C-alpha cells in the first residue's frame, strides 16, 4: 500500500514538475520590471536611482552639442549637479523638441529638460518641477530695419514651434505671416537668409545668438516681452515621485551655492532674475541685484547707456 502510494505520488510529481517550472517562469516574467518601474521602485528605496533625461540639443546656451557631439550647456551642468545631489545615475539623451512630451508620456525616458516653459497647456499633460530659470521673449531683426512688435501685421516672422514665443505670436499677432520651425537654428537660418524679416525667441537664447558671427548684423527690436509663462521647469509624468526628489535636490543646490555658481558661470550673475537683464544687450553698464532668492525679474534694475 505504501509502495503503491509512493508510486502514485512519484507519477504526480513527474507530471507536476513541468507545470511547476512553467509557473515559475511565468511568475518571473510577471515580476520583471520595465525601466520606468525600476525607477519608481528605486525612488521609494535606498537603491540608487537610474534616470534617463531627454533634452533638445540645439538650444544654446541651455543645451547643445560641442564639436565632438557631446551635450553641453547650462541645463546639462544643472542636471549633473542635481543627479549628484540625489546620488543618482543619470543618462542624458537628445530628443527632437516636438517629441519631448510625447516621448516622456510614452515612457521612453523619465524626465525632460529643454528650456521648457511651465504653461497651463503643458501642465494638463505633464507635471513640472519647481522653476529653475525665468526668461521673457524678444523680437530680433536686422540692424537698421524699423520693424517693431506693433508693426508685425503682414510681416514674415520666424519662431520655433511649440514655444512660448510662437504661442505669443499666434495669440497676439495672428495677422502676421508666422513661420514655425522644428529647431531654433532653422529659424536663425531663415532670418539671415532674408526669408523672414524678424524672429521671436526667448530672451536668453536670442541674445546668445546675437553674440555670434551669424548674429552680428542683428539686434533686439523694442523691449523684452514678459508673459505669465516665463518660468522654466523639468517635465515629468504626472504623479511621478521623481518630482519631489528633484525639487528637494534643486532647493539644496540653491542653499549650498551650487545653483548660483552654475547660473553665474553662464549668465554672469548668481541671480536668475538678474540673468534676464544682465545678458540683454551691449551697453548695460550696471546691474543692481536684490539679494533675495525669490526676487522678481522686475526688481532688477539695469542702467543702459547708448553707444554713439
Name what the model sees in each region.
Residues 76, 84, 89-151, 219, ...:
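Acidic, polar ligand-binding/catalytic clefts
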Residues 31-33, 167-182, 218-220, 250-308:
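Ligand-binding clefts/hinges and TM-proximal coupling segments of bilobed small-molecule sensing domains
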Residues 99-102, 116-124, 171, 192, ...:
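A ligand-binding cleft/hinge motif common to bilobed small-molecule-binding domains
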Residues 25-28:
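C-terminal motif of bacterial Sec signal peptides marking the signal peptidase cleavage site
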Residues 37-115:
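Extracytoplasmic small-molecule ligand-binding "clamshell" domains
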Residues 76-77, 91-102, 144, 161, ...:
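Short helix-initiation/N-cap motifs at beta->coil->alpha
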Residues 57, 133-140, 203, 211-251, ...:
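Periplasmic-binding protein-like
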Residues 30-32, 76-85, 151, 155-156, ...:
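Extended ligand-binding regions for polar small-molecule ligands
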Amino acid at each position: 500500500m505504501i509502495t503503491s502510494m509512493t508510486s502514485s505520488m512519484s507519477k504526480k510529481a513527474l507530471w507536476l514538475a513541468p507545470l511547476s517550472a512553467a509557473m515559475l517562469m511565468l511568475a518571473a516574467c510577471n515580476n520583471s520590471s520595465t525601466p520606468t518601474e525600476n525607477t519608481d521602485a528605486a525612488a521609494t528605496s535606498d537603491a540608487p536611482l537610474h534616470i534617463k533625461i531627454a533634452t533638445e540639443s540645439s538650444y544654446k546656451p541651455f543645451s547643445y552639442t560641442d564639436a565632438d557631439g557631446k551635450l553641453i550647456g547650462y541645463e546639462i551642468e544643472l542636471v549633473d549637479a542635481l543627479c549628484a545631489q540625489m546620488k543618482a545615475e543619470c543618462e542624458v539623451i537628445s530628443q527632437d523638441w516636438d517629441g519631448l512630451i510625447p516621448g516622456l508620456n510614452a515612457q521612453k525616458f523619465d524626465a525632460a529638460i529643454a528650456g521648457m516653459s511651465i504653461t497651463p497647456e503643458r501642465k494638463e499633460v505633464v507635471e513640472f518641477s519647481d522653476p529653475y530659470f525665468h526668461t521673457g521673449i524678444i523680437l530680433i531683426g536686422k540692424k537698421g530695419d524699423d520693424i517693431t512688435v506693433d508693426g508685425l501685421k503682414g510681416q514674415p516672422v520666424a519662431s520655433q514651434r511649440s514655444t512660448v514665443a510662437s504661442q505669443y505670436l499666434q495669440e497676439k499677432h495672428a495677422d502676421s505671416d508666422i513661420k514655425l520651425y522644428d529647431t531654433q537654428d532653422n529659424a536663425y537660418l531663415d532670418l539671415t537668409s532674408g526669408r523672414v524679416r524678424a524672429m521671436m525667441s526667448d530672451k536668453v537664447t536670442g541674445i546668445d545668438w546675437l553674440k555670434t558671427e551669424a548674429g552680428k548684423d542683428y539686434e533686439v527690436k523694442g523691449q523684452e516681452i514678459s508673459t505669465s509663462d516665463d518660468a522654466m521647469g523639468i517635465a515629468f509624468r504626472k504623479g511621478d515621485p521623481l518630482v519631489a526628489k528633484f525639487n528637494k535636490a534643486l532647493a539644496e543646490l540653491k542653499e549650498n551655492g551650487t545653483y548660483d555658481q552654475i547660473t553665474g558661470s553662464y549668465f554672469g550673475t548668481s541671480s536668475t532674475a538678474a540673468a534676464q537683464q544682465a545678458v540683454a544687450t551691449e551697453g548695460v553698464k550696471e546691474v543692481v541685484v536684490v539679494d533675495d532668492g525669490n526676487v522678481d525679474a522686475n526688481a532688477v534694475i539695469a542702467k543702459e547707456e547708448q553707444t554713439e
